[in-house]
Swiss-Prot record:
Domain of life according to the entry: Bacteria
Region (DNA-binding): 1-89
Annotated protein name in UniProt: Ferric uptake regulation protein
Entry function: Acts as a global negative controlling element, employing Fe(2+) as a cofactor to bind the operator of the repressed genes.
Coiled-coil stretches noted in the UniProt entry, renumbered to this chain: none
Biological process (GO), any one: regulation of secondary metabolite biosynthetic process
Family, similarity comment: Belongs to the Fur family.
UniProt binding sites for Fe cation: H92, D94, E113, H130
Cellular localisation: Cytoplasm
Length: 141
């Protein structure tokens, strides 16, 4: 899915919130800005040490926690695997998780969104937030 939005400047947002932007944090922010996948902390760590081998895994975990607390990223705990992360910005989308490869595919369906709204309203509710994760196996060709 092409993301039809401009990625926010998290560095500026964090500075405004009084967070010091260290070199390791800047590297991690750049990784998150450039990624098109949903990496886990270990994958972010692997990418970060390619730029600076002094970055520790605990620095990655602390930074991810900080970014999550500030609303800059979303943590996804897809079944059967470690928490994975994505930026909190952009248009709403849902996820298909390939149960064999672990790949995550983003998608949006107006039909699904409309149906969810209709169901919630018919039961006397208004959707405030939701997450849809479809766990799938690829069709055999």
């Amino acid at each position: 899915m092409n993301k039809p939005y401009t990625k926010p400047d998290y560095e500026q947002e964090l500075r405004r919130a009084g967070v010091r932007i260290t070199r390791p944090r800047r590297i991690i922010l750049n990784i998150l800005n450039e990624t098109e996948d949903h990496p886990d902390a270990l994958e972010i760590f692997r990418r970060a040490v390619e730029e600076d081998d002094s970055i520790s895994l605990s620095t990655v975990y602390r930074t991810m926690k900080l970014l999550e607390e500030r609303g800059a990223i979303h943590r996804h705990a897809f079944a059967g695997g470690p928490s994975r992360f994505e930026q909190a910005s952009g248009a709403h989308h849902d996820h298909i998780i390939d149960m064999d490869s672990g790949d995550v595919v983003e998608f949006h369906s107006d039909k699904i969104e409309k149906l969810q709204e209709e169901i919630a309203r018919s039961l006397g509710f208004e959707i405030v937030h939701h997450r849809l994760e479809l766990y799938c196996k690829k069709l055999k060709s």
